[in-house]
Amino acid sequence: MAGTLFIILRFVDTTLPSSRVYCVRSLEVSVAVELAAATVLAFESIGVVDDCGRSVLFSIILIAAFICSVFLIASEDIAGSRRSTGSCVTLWEGRNISFCLYRSNWLNTVPVGYMFFLRKNRSLDERYF
């Protein structure tokens, strides 16, 4: 699972342009997990997959749902458009972007638990958050 996550992060790092700030809300991640689990259970209940194929199908659907949430659901340019204070912990640093867990103190606009794909050369200070 860790290897799969690393491959996804490397793909996103080399694909996304570094001139924008992209985010994935924790809500979309949880929806992706629930969608994958529900799909696997549906296929299993009608006899399409067995115990062996269940984990493979779940992994494929989860990865696809996560990639879709990154590129389609939650990508937005937030640089300069939102102001708040908070802290960002870098989880993984790539060539163009960093994968950070951001905890905001400004709960009215930016919920706690946002995960950001941030430009690597962007300073993480109150000018942007």
UniProtKB/Swiss-Prot annotation:
The keyword Signal does not apply. Residues 1-28, 76-129 are cytoplasmic. Residues 50-54 are extracellular. Disulfide bonds: none annotated. GO terms for cellular component: membrane. It comes from the Eukaryota. It is found in: Membrane. Keywords: Membrane, Transmembrane, Transmembrane helix. Coiled coil: none annotated. It is a multi-pass membrane protein. The chain crosses the membrane at residues 29-49, 55-75. The keyword Phosphoprotein does not apply. Partially overlaps CMP2. This is Putative uncharacterized membrane protein YML057C-A.
